[in-house]
Amino acid sequence: MITWNNLDTLTSFKELENVERVDLVKAMAGENGAERVKNYSVPMAEGLTYNYAAKQVDDKVLAALAKLADEAQLTEKFEALYNGEVINTGEKRLVLHHMTRGQLGEAVEADGVDKRTFYTEQQAKIADFANKVHAGEITNGAGEKFTTVVQIGIGGSDLGPRAMYLALENWAKKNDTFKMEAKFISNVDPDDAAAVLNSIDVAHSIFVLVSKSGTTLETLTNESFVKDALKNAGLDASKHMIAVTSETSPLAKSDDYLAAFFMDDYIGGRYSSTSAVGGAVLSLAFGPEVFAQFLDGAAAEDALSKNKDVFKNPAMLDALIGVYERNVLGYPSTAVLPYSQALSRFPAHLQQLDMESNGKSVNRFGEPVNYPTGPVIFGEPGTNGQHSFYQLLHQGTDIVPLQFVGYKNSQMETDVVIQDSTSQQKLCANVAAQIVAFACGKSDENSNKNFEGGRPSSIIIGDQVNPASLGALLAHFENKVMFQGFLWNLNSFDQEGVQLGKVLAKRVLAHETDGALKVFSDLLNI
């Protein structure tokens, strides 16, 4: 039987608090460090590896973390989730994003249908539509092929799909699977939509409107912006727009769209990249086969997350170490540092994934918790970040755990040799150097040049960013966040924190304000 308990009530957590702290500088020095790098490593799916040698752990800490995983019933809770139990307690909903890429357990029926069948049917419909667009069977009003796809959405309807598109754009061009350029409109700031519309040929563009409810203010505002641009160009908007929405939304059967593809209430926006939300734009941009490879990579990583052995379950181990850093060592934030320009927007997606899921101060029963929960997530690609905020990471007063991601090979495979090394070798040399520099530091009599070290990090290493490895990387972090939510006894699948601002904004627009809200509204000339 599964029990849901706060982290600070677990016996194994109290034992973890009493385990002797690791001196990371000493642990990573010399041959000790070399042995840790060899031994503290867990295989992931699709050729990826999670290496935690530079984390502030040793065998004693790891043994305590394994006990915590057992007592917190992490794999049992994951099993309950993928077998269709109501895990989103706040909204009384199932949590089924894993089922968009595979079936990990029992068949799950909801709304009178088998959910795995529902998701695969939507994927098949999207694939058929995308293939017809690419073949010129579905065209604009003049019978001409579409060349650009524009996604209109916000939050999870934008951040994840945008990050995945950018991650695979150059790979697709190199591998001759690039079909259409993709653009994204998300912000209600009119300059966002105007800039995108000014950069494309609207006559040859197809727009994907993404709104589960069909009532999202920002998205519908931007849809009107786009429809106005199409009308001004003498075009029929209904020949240029498709919808990704729920079957019960007002968009589902509207004549305003070429086609509608469906999601449901069991997939949160930040977990929706492997659903129709990501499927439509990625299939149009790169072809359905590429999206299928992306799903396969995610499914393979999901399968690893079922393993009860924490040392064969990279997402669970990553989650446990993160909770140790947050709740025992007291570190307030985590930097995500991919050494790949392809992953330029991946930190922004992970920021939403993590902070919207676990940025909670009450447990799944609505009771206040007495311990820190989700960390602040931020990051930029390397080596750019080294010349930006790494100064604070190396010598600041806060210790910030680091999550590196690095690849042995570039996507474009175009490179030059300068000073006896390629650009890719320089990139990889920098990430290796940073891990050791953060961990070991460097003593100097000049205090301004002294590096204390003891800055923990992990790295996920792969051969190349491709559809399958990207899917595995995404699933790793989704499952890490899930496991941490289980440990903190949170509901990681709602986001009430976004609601209050929306309510107040509607009051401002209706001029129903007083006090500070009225004064701020007047200052902004609303």
PLM features per residue range, with description:
Residues M164-E169, N198-V202, S224-V226, L350-N358, ...:
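Short, solvent-exposed amphipathic alpha-helical segments in soluble enzyme
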Residues D128-G136, A142-K308, R507-A510:
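Glycine-rich phosphate-binding loops that contact phosphosugars or nucleotide phosphates
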Residues A229-T414, G453, L500-I526:
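Active-site phosphate/pyrophosphate-binding segments
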Residues K449, V465-L517:
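C-terminal structured subdomain/cap of oxidoreductase catalytic cores
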